[in-house]
UniProtKB/Swiss-Prot annotation:
Gene3D superfamilies in alphabetical order: Aspartate Aminotransferase, domain 1, Type I PLP-dependent aspartate aminotransferase-like (Major domain)
Keyword Amino-acid biosynthesis attributed: yes
Organism name: Buchnera aphidicola subsp. Cinara cedri (strain Cc)
Protein's UniProt name: Serine hydroxymethyltransferase
Entry GO MF terms: glycine hydroxymethyltransferase activity; pyridoxal phosphate binding
HAMAP family found in the cross-reference section: SHMT
Length: 417
C-alpha cells in the first residue's frame, strides 16, 4: 500500500487532480485571496514530512524522532523573523482563522467585548461576525466605512469609547484603502485595549514596503501565508510588542490551546515561501500587484463602472454592479464562462444577501505571479467590462473565452498544458 502510484491506485482522484490543474492553467484567476505556489513548495507539501507528529515546540516535543523536524521549524522561524523584522514568531497555526482564534484565546476571556470591521463593509468572518466563533464566544461590535468607502475613524473612536472593547481588530478581506494603524493604536490606548491586526491580505505588500506596516503599533499581528505572500495555505502569528508574557500566552494558545500536532510539511513550505519573499524579485512582484490593481481600477472607472471608494491602494478592489442590474453572483458566473474567475462580494450597505451580493471582488496577485504582462491585463479588464455590459451576449463571451485561453497558453503556471 505504501509504494502505490496515484494514477494506478486511485484513478478517480488522479483524474480530478489533472482536471483541476488544467482548469487552473486555462483560466485567468482574479480572486484576491488566491495565488500560485512554486514547484518547490508543492514538493515540500507532498513530502514525507506529512507523516511526522510533532506536538509541542522546538526541543520540547511530546513525541520522539523530532530532531530533524526541530531543525525545519527553526529555519521557518528564523526566516520569518528576518522577513518581518520581529522578535516573536509562531509558524504552527494551520490557517489564518486558527491563528486568529489563538490570538483571541490568548488575550481575551469568553464574553469579552471586541470591535472589528463589519463583514459587509470589508471585514472578515473572524473579526466578530455573529456566524463565526469570534461573534459567538465574544461580544462583538463593528465599525465600517463612510460614504466615500473609507474607514470611518470618527465612528471607530466613538464606538470604542462607547463599548470599551478589550480588543480592537484591524485588517480586512475586501477593503482597498490604506489603514491608519497609528491612529487605531491611539484609540486602543485611550481605552486600555489590545490592538490586534490581521494582515492576511496585504502581507506581501507590507514586507515589500509598499503598504503601511502595523507591527510598530499592534500588540499582535496575524496573517495567512498564501494570498499576496504566495506561500502555502497556512497561518502565522508575529509580534514586536516586547511583552514576554503575551508571547508565552500566544504559544500556549496555539498548543495545546487550539491545536495538537503542527503540519510539518506545511511549515517546511512556509519556510520556503519566506525565503522566496526575502529575494529582491519579490519586491518587484508586489510592486506589479499594486500597479496592475491601480491600472484595472482606472479602466473600470473610464468604462463607467462604479468602484467602491473610486480607487485602490492595495491588491484588490470592489465593483458595485447595482446600476448594471446584475448581481455579483450572476456576474461571477457569467465571467467564468469566459474563463475569468472572480468572486461575488457584498458591498457596503448591500441590499442583496451574501449569497447573491451586489458586487464582485477583483485581485491581482495570481495574474502577476503567473507573469502576465500589463498589455494583456488591460485587454482582460476591457473584456470584463464588455461582458458585464452585455451579459447575455453569448457569442461575445465565447469569443473572449477563446482569447483568454490563448493568453493562458502563452503564460503557463507550471508547464505547457
Amino acid at each position: 500500500m505504501i509504494n502505490t502510484n496515484l494514477k494506478n491506485y486511485d484513478p478517480k482522484i488522479w483524474k480530478l487532480i489533472i482536471k483541476e490543474k488544467k482548469r487552473q492553467e486555462s483560466y485567468i484567476n482574479l480572486i484576491a485571496s488566491e495565488n500560485y505556489v512554486s514547484s518547490s513548495i508543492l514538493e515540500a507539501q507532498g513530502s514525507c514530512l506529512t507523516n511526522k507528529y510533532a506536538e509541542g515546540y522546538i526541543g520540547n516535543r511530546f513525541y520522539n524522532g523530532c530532531n530533524i523536524i526541530d531543525k525545519i521549524e527553526k529555519i521557518a522561524i528564523k526566516r520569518a523573523k528576518k522577513l518581518f523584522n520581529v522578535e516573536y514568531v509562531n509558524v504552527q497555526p494551520h490557517s489564518g482563522s486558527q491563528a486568529n482564534f489563538s490570538v483571541f484565546n490568548a488575550l481575551l476571556k469568553p464574553n469579552d467585548i471586541i470591535l472589528g470591521m463589519n463583514l459587509n463593509h470589508g471585514g472578515h468572518l473572524t473579526h466578530g461576525s455573529t456566524v463565526n466563533f469570534s461573534g459567538k464566544l465574544y461580544k462583538s461590535f463593528s465599525y465600517g466605512v463612510n460614504k466615500c468607502g473609507e474607514i470611518d475613524y470618527d465612528a471607530l473612536k466613538y464606538l470604542s469609547h462607547l463599548h470599551r472593547p478589550k480588543m480592537i481588530i484591524g485588517g480586512f478581506s475586501a477593503y482597498s484603502g490604506i489603514c491608519d494603524w497609528k491612529y487605531m493604536r491611539k484609540i486602543a490606548d485611550e481605552i486600555n485595549a489590545y490592538f490586534f491586526v490581521d494582515i492576511s491580505h496585504i502581507v506581501g505588500l507590507i514586507v515589500a514596503g509598499i503598504y503601511p506596516n502595523p507591527l510598530k503599533y499592534a500588540h499582535v499581528v496575524s496573517t495567512t501565508t498564501h494570498k499576496t505572500l504566495g506561500g502555502p495555505r497556512g497561518g502565522l502569528i508575529i509580534s514586536n510588542c516586547g511583552n514576554k508574557k503575551i508571547y508565552s500566552k500566544l504559544d500556549s494558545s496555539v498548543f495545546p490551546g487550539s491545536q495538537g500536532g503542527p503540519l510539518m510539511h506545511v511549515i517546511a513550505a512556509k519556510a520556503i515561501s519566506f525565503k522566496e519573499a526575502l529575494e529582491p524579485k519579490f519586491f518587484l512582484l508586489q510592486k506589479n500587484i499594486l500597479f496592475f490593481s491601480k491600472k484595472m481600477v482606472k479602466i473600470f472607472l473610464k468604462r463607467n463602472f462604479s468602484v467602491i471608494s473610486g480607487k485602490t491602494n492595495n491588491h484588490l478592489f470592489l465593483i458595485d454592479l447595482s446600476e448594471k442590474k446584475i448581481s455579483g453572483k450572476e456576474a461571477s458566473n457569467i465571467l467564468a464562462l469566459a474563463r475569468i474567475i472572480v468572486n461575488k462580494n457584498t458591498i457596503p450597505n448591500d441590499s442583496q444577501s451574501p449569497y447573491i451580493t451586489s458586487g464582485i471582488r477583483i485581485g491581482t496577485p495570481a495574474i502577476v505571479k503567473r507573469g502576465i504582462s500589463i498589455k494583456y491585463v488591460i485587454k482582460i479588464t476591457n473584456w470584463i467590462c464588455d461582458i458585464l455590459n452585455e451579459p447575455n451576449n453569448l457569442i461575445k463571451i465565447k469569443k473572449i473565452s477563446k482569447k483568454i485561453k490563448k493568453i493562458c497558453y502563452k503564460y503557463p503556471i507550471y508547464n505547457k498544458i
